[in-house]
Amino acid sequence: VTALVCAPLFSMAHAQDARPAAAPPAAAQDKTLTVFAAASMKNALDEANAAFTAKSDVKVTSSYAASSALAKQLEQGAPADIFISADTDWMDYSSGKKTISDATRVNLLGNKIVLIAPKDSKLADVKIGQGFDLAKLAGDGKIATGDVKAVPVGKYAKAALEKLGAWQAAEPKFAMAESVRAALALVSRGEAALGIVYETDAKVDPGVKIIGAFPADSHPAIIYPVAATATAKTDATGYLAFLRSAAAK
């Protein structure tokens, strides 16, 4: 008897479970975007995100790190709607892994690499060109930049120094950081005598000063591509359009 009574109850419970869940009201719909962005984008992007939210009521949360780390996180399934890389290589990598929407990819902006020193350093107005002796300039100190094997700023730095004939002598003095902001911090704290970072980062840290600029033709062009991810929400389209607009400049 027990079996005969329980069977219908079991069936009814599953029938109830199978009913589609009611759609949330429009006000409860998810109005957020997650942006994975190169560390060097932080200051400018924080401002742009605030402006976009004020305009659209879509809240934007950004995660800043080295482009290499972000691309790997996307590959591992980390949730994000937008990816902004500090070089084309890691965006190409993400394209190959099918983690971005190629149709949405555009080049957003550019940058420069500069030589920096702590603000109280006596070094100034360093001419950077062929035969530039970076190793001698650093003395007994370290030279900070991003990991030259993975972090875009480090890759640009190595390319420039190789072209200028300064890499071989300077290589042993390098302190490789996980991101451009980490390299910047080493110089700002006085833990490195010199650093090679993006101009935009150097300008926002009062603890450092720019003492030289690398010739544009000494390294590949510094381009920041942006794209929606393969799993992006629909609001990502409006965000991308905003980043390219005059309002975000």
Listing of model-derived features with the role each one plays in the protein:
Residues 16-78, 85-88, 92-249:
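Exported/periplasmic ABC-transporter solute-binding proteins
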Residues 1-11:
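Bacterial N-terminal signal peptides
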